[in-house]
Amino acid sequence: GLSDSEKSAVASLWEKIAPQTNKLGAESMERLFKNHPETKSFFSRFDISPGSQDLLTHGGKIFGALGEAIKSLDNLQKYQDLHTNKLKLSSDHMKLLSAAIIEVFTAHFGGEVNQAAWNKFLGEVGAILTSS
């Protein structure tokens, strides 16, 4: 699990992210597609052009789930059933998405991002969401 200082680092940055979850979620998906074009095939029904409503909506859903997880940093296991079936994410793809998310956070918030804490948090959320 995350240490108290890691939880604090994640929660404090989230306060700045929360008002712009759709925008930052969409940017994270755009970054994922740019870094790993092969992932576009999972979104064949989406308009994946930058800033599209599909990306804003889906990015917002992903970040909404992260926000819910952050509210329960002490009990992340309760998210196990939430997205696994709906997202059908492999752990490899979750790692790629997590890296894209951290890149976007760093681009927006620079030194305020505790990358180690966010890597650990996204890794734990990813492990929960991709376990069967």
Swiss-Prot record:
Positions with a binding annotation for heme b: 58, 83
GO cellular component: blood microparticle; haptoglobin-hemoglobin complex; hemoglobin complex
UniProt xrefs under InterPro entries: Globin, Globin-like_sf, Globin/Proto, Hemoglobin_a-typ, Hemoglobin_oxygen_transport
Gene3D superfamilies noted in UniProt: Globins
A biological process from GO: hydrogen peroxide catabolic process
Globin domain segment(s): 1-132
UniProt KW Heme keyword: yes
Domain of life (superkingdom): Eukaryota
Pfam family, any one: Globin
UniProt KW keywords: Heme, Iron, Metal-binding, Oxygen transport, Transport
Gene Ontology MF terms in the entry: haptoglobin binding; heme binding; metal ion binding; organic acid binding; oxygen binding; oxygen carrier activity; peroxidase activity
Keyword field contains Cytoplasm: no
Subunit structure: Monomer.
Other comment: This chain appears to have diverged from the line leading to alpha-type hemoglobin chains close to the divergence of alpha and beta chains.
Family: Belongs to the globin family.
PANTHER family tied to this protein: HEMOGLOBIN FAMILY MEMBER (PTHR11442), HEMOGLOBIN SUBUNIT MU (PTHR11442:SF8)
Known role: This hemoglobin may replace myocardial myoglobin in this amphibian species.
Protein name, UniProt field: Hemoglobin heart muscle subunit alpha-type
Organism: Aquarana catesbeiana
